[in-house]
């Protein structure tokens, strides 16, 4: 029995040494060996199994190889509890720091470059994190509520969520195109197009938003038309009143000036003050005797008011010229002020004399 155990121990040591050198004894292949159950045999079998599993897991997405560093990077992203951890920046990071972090991570975790399991989800998480944090409004809302929105695994759903309540308004693929023009800056690697339910959700949500916006615009159109009509209503009322007033108004029977367009072409004078005025061809038929006398009183009053206003304007003009001549010591202005005639004032003096004499 002791001899048997000694032989088994020697064979176990040889087997472990062969496993470590990645080869087996030529005379005893591992398939035909039945381990004895001792600690050394079990340890050797466990090391062999671990090595085989690691060799299998190095075959990533799309049967492409990946490095241990890439796998650890994907695992780090999946363990992150907020967008700041995903990008590896502080909560007070500036826009430039966010862009720098995104460029670095997007190139590192793009599925066409990183084939480790979960690289696609990690890449989408990076894009979503940058799209939210680079938007001031979304970042403010995320800072207030985002820490409560951790990743979770819903029943009958895939584990990847990455803060679905704070989805970006742009897909990770579109965001990558914005930064790198659809391909890597250092190679001719075309963009991947992995259309998942996140992309579908994004398109469906924005299609619903556009439809809702169109409905709201259509509902607002009648209200906008009504508001515009209410605003224009006062203007329309003024225009209508003005037109009606002009239609109902009658032209006066006289004019102090010659107006051929209105038919005031016949010249006349008042009997008392000899004030000139103009009438139309039908004036004599309408005004005679007392009616003519009353009308001429009205004409004289209007004429005196007109002459008084004109006289005041002439005096005002002469006074201003005199003041300017004294202020600037301008002899030319002084002469012009002195030569200015007050014709309407002279007419007014004559009318006052006639009224006193009458």
UniProtKB/Swiss-Prot annotation:
Cite the J domain residue spans from the record. 82-146
Which species is this record about?
Answer: Homo sapiens (Human)
Query: Cellular component per GO?
Result: endoplasmic reticulum membrane
What is this protein's record name? DnaJ homolog subfamily C member 18
Transmembrane residue ranges: 228-248
Query: What function is annotated for this protein?
Result: (Microbial infection) In case of infection by polyomavirus, involved in the virus endoplasmic reticulum membrane penetration and infection. Regulates the recruitment of DNAJB12:DNAJB14 into SV40-induced foci and all cooperate to guide SV40 across the endoplasmic reticulum membrane. The foci represent the site from which SV40 penetrates into the cytosol.
GO BP field: cellular response to misfolded protein; chaperone cofactor-dependent protein refolding
Instruction: Give the main location.
Output: endoplasmic reticulum
Q: Write out the GO MF terms.
A: Hsp70 protein binding
Q: Is Transmembrane included in the keywords of this UniProt record?
A: yes
* Keywords in alphabetical order: Chaperone, Endoplasmic reticulum, Membrane, Transmembrane, Transmembrane helix
**Cellular localization per UniProt:** Endoplasmic reticulum membrane
């Amino acid at each position: 029995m002791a001899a048997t155990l000694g032989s088994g121990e020697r064979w176990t040591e040889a087997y472990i040494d062969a496993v470590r050198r990645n080869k087996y004894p030529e005379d005893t292949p591992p398939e035909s060996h039945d381990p004895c159950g001792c600690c050394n045999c079990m340890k050797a079998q466990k090391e062999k199994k671990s090595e085989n599993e690691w060799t299998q897991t190095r075959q990533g997405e799309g049967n492409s190889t990946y490095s241990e560093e890439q796998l650890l990077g994907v695992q780090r992203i999946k363990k992150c509890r907020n967008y700041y951890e995903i990008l590896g920046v502080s909560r007070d990071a500036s826009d430039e720091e966010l862009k720098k972090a995104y460029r670095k991570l997007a190139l590192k975790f793009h599925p066409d470059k990183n084939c480790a399991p979960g690289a696609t989800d990690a890449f989408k998480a990076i894009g979503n994190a940058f799209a939210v944090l680079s938007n001031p409004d979304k970042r403010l809302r995320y800072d207030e509520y985002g820490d409560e929105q951790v990743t979770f695994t819903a029943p009958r759903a895939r584990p990847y969520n990455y803060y679905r309540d704070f989805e970006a308004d742009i897909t990770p693929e579109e965001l990558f195109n914005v930064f790198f023009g659809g391909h890597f800056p250092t190679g001719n690697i075309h963009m991947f197009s992995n259309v998942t339910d996140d992309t579908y959700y994004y398109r469906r949500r924005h299609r619903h938003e556009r439809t809702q916006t169109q409905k709201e615009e259509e509902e607002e159109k009648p209200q906008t038309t009504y508001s515009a009509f209410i605003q224009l209503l006062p203007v329309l009322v003024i225009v209508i009143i003005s037109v009606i007033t002009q239609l109902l108004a009658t032209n006066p029977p006289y004019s102090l000036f010659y107006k051929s367009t209105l038919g005031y072409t016949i010249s006349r004078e008042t009997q008392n003050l000899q004030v000139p005025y103009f009438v139309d061809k039908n004036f004599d038929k309408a005004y005679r005797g007392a009616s003519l006398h009353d009308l001429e009183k009205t004409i004289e009053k209007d004429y005196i008011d007109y002459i008084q206003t004109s006289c005041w304007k002439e005096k005002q003009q002469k006074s201003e010229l005199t003041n300017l001549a004294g202020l600037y010591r301008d002899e030319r202005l002084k002469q012009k002020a002195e030569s200015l005639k007050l014709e309407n004032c002279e007419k007014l003096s004559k009318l006052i004399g006639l009224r006193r004499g009458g």
